[in-house]
Amino acid sequence: MTALPRRIGMLGGTFDPVHIGHLRGALEVAELLELDELRLTPSARPPHRDMPSVTAEDRLAMVQSAVAGVSPLTVDDRELKRDKPSYTLDTLESMRAELAPRDQLFLLLGWDAFCGLPTWHRWEELLEHCHIVVLQRPDADSESPDAMRNLLAARAVSDPKALKGPGGQITFVWQTPLSVSATQIRQLLASGKSVRFLVPDAVLAYIDARGLYRAPNTDGSS
């Protein structure tokens, strides 16, 4: 009997720190697409963003604590093991090599990241390895950049559940709007305010135990 193709998702990010917006969005997509596994993949040296505020080890530990016991969410640390920029194409190629030919691989991207794809390393090759699932918010600008219009005309599928084959198509998934950002959380922590209910309790405990994101003490006291 032929085994059914596996359905694997990837959500990359700095996760600096991971928060409920990341996690709720990931879980919604995993359930909608009936994924066997959705891998949260922390990036080490993101080419298109500032360097993270805390170490890779801390960011990885926070993501691991956030998804512990939450199926089908898992953590993939391969980008943290590379001594070079975290190019998504390299990660997809590596993941694809581990899967069976018929297995489906889904790359989850936020709207802003999707619109910025033309600036990514060898971005035209991404769809050779995966489907792209764009996480869309009701308040987002829905006008796609000119560079993406021909691609969308050729590859877009309106029903996320209708994606066929191991890769090559693009679809959009509407997200529950949660106005939470890692920047906001870092600012709250730096000002001494609580971020309870913006991050999982296990992540908050980790942040508190290590004093992450706190403003440095400048008053001369120990």
Curated annotation (Swiss-Prot):
MF GO annotations: ATP binding; nicotinate-nucleotide adenylyltransferase activity
EC class, as a word, reads: transferase
Substrates-to-products reaction catalysed: nicotinate beta-D-ribonucleotide + ATP + H(+) = deamido-NAD(+) + diphosphate
Q: In which pathway does it act?
A: Cofactor biosynthesis; NAD(+) biosynthesis; deamido-NAD(+) from nicotinate D-ribonucleotide: step 1/1
Q: Which GO terms describe its biological process?
A: NAD biosynthetic process
**Keywords from the named record:** ATP-binding, NAD, Nucleotide-binding, Nucleotidyltransferase, Pyridine nucleotide biosynthesis, Transferase
Question: Nucleotidyltransferase: is it a keyword of this entry?
Answer: yes
Q: Kindly give the Pfam families that the UniProt entry links to this protein.
A: CTP_transf_like
EC code: 2.7.7.18
Disulfide bond residue pairs = none
UniProt xrefs under InterPro entries:
Cyt_trans-like (IPR004821), NadD/NMNAT (IPR005248), Rossmann-like_a/b/a_fold (IPR014729)
Purpose of the protein: Catalyzes the reversible adenylation of nicotinate mononucleotide (NaMN) to nicotinic acid adenine dinucleotide (NaAD).
Per the record, the similarity remark reads:
Belongs to the NadD family.
Q: What HAMAP family does the record tag this protein with?
A: NaMN_adenylyltr
Report what the protein is called.
Answer: Probable nicotinate-nucleotide adenylyltransferase
**What organism is the protein native to?**
Pseudomonas syringae pv. syringae (strain B728a)
**Gene encoding this polypeptide?**
nadD
